Amino acid sequence: MNEPSDADGFAHVPVLLHRADDLLGPAITAVGDGGEGAYMIDATLGLGGHSEFFLGKYPGLHLIGLDRDTNALRIASERLAPFADRTTFVHTTYDGIEDALEQAGLPSTESVHAILFDLGVSSMQLDEADRGFAYSIDAPLDMRMDQTVGLTAAEVLNTYSHGDLARILSTYGEERFAGKIASEILRQREREPFTTSAALVELLYRTIPAATRRTGGHPAKRTFQALRIEVNAELDSLRAAVPAGLDALAVGGRVVFMSYQSLEDRVVKAELVPRSKSTSPEGLPVELPGMGPEFRILTRGAERASEQEIEENPRSAPVRLRAAERISRRRA
């Protein structure tokens, strides 16, 4: 079987592809030979690399692909055109799972057999200079994954109060110098509003102490992460998406989460771990009806990419992977 191809000129190597298949494949084939009758959600469709692999390997699988980026949906739908009779594409954030299932004619709970969340910024968004996600390239400060709605990163920088800027830098970027950076942003925008990434990167080089710059990675990394999360309300969307995804799984269904930073992984863990434990009072000789664990965790903590995977696909280096299988009906 062929590996996923490039699409629309964008080189795209799906992250942890074969590990995702190891985890999700058994749930797909348990429904029927070749995945006949099985439904999978790709909650972060992107360029469709993961989806192309699963559709190619499991000829009976129907895939529901979600993405908030209209350009990504266009490219993915073209890429997956050979599977048009087994795909449903929905323009939505990943917390729009319930609406996506309705469009596919499925109930919102216990109706799908595999779900993949490949979180963070897509390869295409990083590689498109004019999107403003990459601090290594001077570009308009947009950072919207869906460019049809919402504030841009420039508008956040130019309109937010000192307190709000410091809050998002500290909370979403875990930036030690959040207050100092916020003060410099306010001073600079009084002279000239922010429009491109180069001006922000220059400010961060000036503001973050030299000793920290030498040891803490690129000085813009945390601020750009914080702005991206704020602009796209990523964590709010994820907090709604994780329970919606878990609820959508049928008994025997499996889910894989790939997080690219600790904030995402904490959200996933906070929802997944409690639902994998019994709620029966301690000391009882038997499990009370409806109080047993809903899920079985399939990974030991958060798995990381192997050295070989990172060498072949450097974008897999920060990934934290968690997976689980539904083992009982939803709790009341």
From Swiss-Prot:
HAMAP family: 16SrRNA_methyltr_H (MF_01007)
Catalytic activity, reaction form: cytidine(1402) in 16S rRNA + S-adenosyl-L-methionine = N(4)-methylcytidine(1402) in 16S rRNA + S-adenosyl-L-homocysteine + H(+)
Gene Ontology cellular component annotations, sorted alphabetically: cytoplasm
Disordered: region residues: 302-332
EC number of the protein: 2.1.1.199
Function: Specifically methylates the N4 position of cytidine in position 1402 (C1402) of 16S rRNA.
Binding site for S-adenosyl-L-methionine: G48, G49, H50, D67, Y94, D118, Q125
Encoding gene, per UniProt annotation: rsmH
Name of the protein in question: Ribosomal RNA small subunit methyltransferase H
Location (main, coarse): cytoplasm
Biological process, per Gene Ontology: rRNA base methylation
Enzyme class: transferase
Organism: Rhodococcus erythropolis (strain PR4 / NBRC 100887)
Entry keyword rRNA processing: yes
Family designation: Belongs to the methyltransferase superfamily. RsmH family.
Domain of life assignment: Bacteria
Keyword terms, alphabetized: Cytoplasm, Methyltransferase, rRNA processing, S-adenosyl-L-methionine, Transferase
GO molecular function: rRNA (cytosine-N4-)-methyltransferase activity
Cell location: Cytoplasm
UniProt feature, compositional bias: Basic and acidic residues: 322-332
